[in-house]
Amino acid sequence: MPSAPSRTLSSGTVSPVPSPSMPPAPSILPGLALALGVAVVSMLVAPLLPGISALVLAIVVGVVLANVVPLPRAAAPGLAIASKKLLRAGIVLLGLQVALGDLASLGIGMLLVVVAVVGVGILGTVQLGRLVGVGRHLTVLIACGFSICGAAAVAAAAGVTDPDDEREEDTVTAVALVVLCGSLMIVLVPAAAALMGLHGETAGLWAGASIHEVAQVVAAGGAIGGGAALTVAVIVKLARVLMLAPVMAVMSMQQRRHGAKDGKQPPLVQLFVVGFLAMVLVRSFMPLPEPVLEAGSLLQTLLLAAAMFALGTGVRISLLKQVGPRPFLLAALSTVLVASVALGGVLLVA
């Protein structure tokens, strides 16, 4: 009979990580309570840190906590649930933030720019990763995070390419690079836009098409001048978020073609991708009251932040120290690539 999968805690002990459907409710409560509690605190603190989302803050807390304070063995089953089930539920609810009507207001030209940014960004980053010598899995996570929507895209891609969490260090490394490069872009994009004579909505379009995290786009849009610039920046960013669905679907099909290590075929399209698209349609064609949308946004952030914390607890800093300079070089090149494609597209259609 095959042995159950295990999870190594920071204390060096190993505890079983059952499948999400296996543990009884009482056994998952400690880990879920810990993850959700940290998520709530992250949501309260994140607004005080411009450009840093609750998701990023939660994963940092998870890494630090797991490597400084021995986590109780009782938390392992709940953390396993949080890193899988809560992650997928949060991505589904992310679809409620995207309204097709808002995206249509950008015009076909700008929507094509968004497709080009995501497509060229991902394919180009994968090629750059080969040239620089970064492992394929980490390269794919960087490509998705930098081209689509930051930490959420990294986690979604990891859920498709690493369903057993065997390479959690790659996930945390990619998120850390999103924070580093995206934070620099909060300053660089408004400054570069001013130097090039781009103002108002044009600068906002570039910010939304080039910066990694939604929170970072909001910070940059405010620095550009707020108002219309901030509005279009966020709408363009949400158009990139919508690209999460087709990209994850393509990645799922690639995984299916290559097959899993245990011989089992992964699903043709991950269920959370279908759920994400369903929520986009609900937001676009059903009159949802503002309190419902606000509640959905809060719940989505809560679930994703809890999942990020859980992912962070599985990471050992000693392994992160072995990353080396190559991923940083790839992140810089990917940022330049995405920003350049975005700028060229905006100048063509603006």
Predicted regions and their residues:
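Helix-coil boundary and interhelical linker segments in multi-pass alpha-helical membrane proteins
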Residues: 44, 100-109, 193-203, 222-232, ...
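Structural signature of hydrophobic alpha-helical transmembrane segments
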Residues: 49-64, 82-86, 106-119, 143-146, ...
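Cytoplasmic-side transmembrane-helix entry/capping segments in multi-pass membrane proteins
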Residues: 77-90, 111-115, 135-146, 169-177, ...
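Helix-loop-helix hairpins and the membrane-proximal interhelical loops
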Residues: 90-136, 159-175, 179, 324
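Oxyanion-binding "anion nests"
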Residues: 221-263
